[in-house]
Swiss-Prot record:
GO molecular function, one term: NAD binding
Gene3D superfamilies per UniProt: Dihydrodipicolinate Reductase, domain 2, NAD(P)-binding Rossmann-like Domain
Functional pathway: Amino-acid biosynthesis; L-arginine biosynthesis; N(2)-acetyl-L-ornithine from L-glutamate: step 3/4
Similarity comment: family membership: Belongs to the NAGSA dehydrogenase family. Type 1 subfamily.
InterPro entries in alphabetical order: AGPR_AS, AGPR_type-1, NAD(P)-bd_dom_sf, NAGSA_dehydrogenase, Semialdehyde_DH_NAD-bd
Origin species: Shewanella woodyi (strain ATCC 51908 / MS32)
Subcellular compartments: Cytoplasm
Its EC number(s): 1.2.1.38
Entry's Gene Ontology BP terms: L-arginine biosynthetic process
Protein name stated in the entry: N-acetyl-gamma-glutamyl-phosphate reductase
Length: 326
């Protein structure tokens, strides 16, 4: 059994990955950790999330002594922490020889010049960054298996890239237009006015400036127009994407492109039938649906995932299973 420490376990994503690892007979939880200043330190996870009443582990403060114990006892560490926190923790644990599964954006760009603009910090660990691989599980399995620094993709990029990567060679240079809606858990657990029950409403945000736009573009190899929206539901993402395909592309070409997922059990592709968020909520699945207009060459593809599962925790769990080869 492999031992995994989970840092940032009090948040939505941290609690979700805790539940997945707890249920995995090939893994054991070394410990659950929060920052030393957290109001949740010392509490059992089940006090914060009664859904996980079967998990009695406490949320321990991440002291220097705790970090040393993790380095001694664990095989891997999951970071469900803020980008600026993960930046330093990931480098430290990587240098101790642990495999790092980072759910933040601190290691998703290989080009360190991207970080000041999109994350507000200079990247201090170019050597560690050079080892980082992008953990899009269905596409980068070999790299995930070989590397000890796995940057788990963002939720919107996971939904968008799963839809677009199979058809990239069929697309023109016209920018794909991605309109995506996420449930409010994507904004995190901290209280905010715009995500409170009485205030939340369907609205776009981060227009022409969301940090997931360059993440999608980098991994796709093509610029995109990406507009995220906040929806008045708890969890899930629906991305509806319009792309122009090259002249002469046929419906059969599209079918063949998406056949790459025939052996991917977590990805379902349907033609002329579009996914619903409710069908993927609380699952590790991605549902794709597409329709093609041969007269105009436009393809519309919709992608539905659970933002806390396939968009975060269950994809991290996939990466753990791929890396430790079970």
């Amino acid at each position: 059994m492999k031992s995994i420490a989970i840092i940032g376990a009090s948040g939505y994503t941290g609690a979700q990955i805790t539940s997945l690892i707890d249920a995995d007979k090939n893994l054991v939880i070394q410990g659950l950790y929060v920052s030393e200043n957290s109001v949740d330190k010392g509490k059992p996870l089940s006090e914060l999330y009664p859904t996980y009443s079967h998990i009695s582990l406490p949320l321990s403060p991440l002291s220097d002594e705790a970090k040393a114990l993790i380095a001694e006892q664990a095989d891997g560490v999951v970071l469900a922490t803020d980008h600026a926190v993960s930046l330093h923790l990931a480098a430290w644990f990587f240098e101790q020889g642990l495999t790092v599964f980072d759910l933040s954006g601190a290691y998703r760009f290989s080009d360190k010049s991207q970080y000041p603009q999109w994350y507000g910090f200079e990247h201090d660990y170019p050597q560690v960054l050079s080892h980082a691989v992008y953990g899009l599980a269905e596409w980068n399995g070999a790299d995930i298996a070989d590397s000890k620094m796995i940057a788990v993709p963002g939720c919107y990029p996971t939904a968008s890239l799963t839809a677009l990567k199979p058809i990239h060679s069929l697309m023109t240079s016209s920018l794909p237009v991605i309109n995506a809606v996420s449930g409010v858990t994507g904004a995190g657990r901290k209280a905010q006015l715009n995500t409170s029950f009485c205030e939340v409403s369907l609205t776009p945000y981060g227009v022409l400036g969301h940090r997931h736009q360059p993440e999608i573009a980098t991994q796709l190899g093509q610029e995109v127009i990406f507009t995220p929206h906040l929806g008045n539901f708890k969890r899930g993402i629906l991305a509806t994407i319009t792309v122009q395909l090259k002249e002469g592309v046929t419906q059969a070409d599209i079918e063949q492109a998406y056949a790459i997922y025939d052996n991917a059990p977590l990805v379902t592709v349907k033609q002329n039938q579009f996914p619903k968020v409710d069908d993927v909520t609380n699952t590790p699945n991605c549902h794709l649906g597409w329709k093609f207009d041969p007269k105009t060459g436009y393809l519309v593809v919709a992608s539905a995932i659970d933002n806390l599962m396939k968009g975060a925790a269950s994809q991290a769990h996939q990466c753990i299973k791929i890396h430790f080869k079970y």
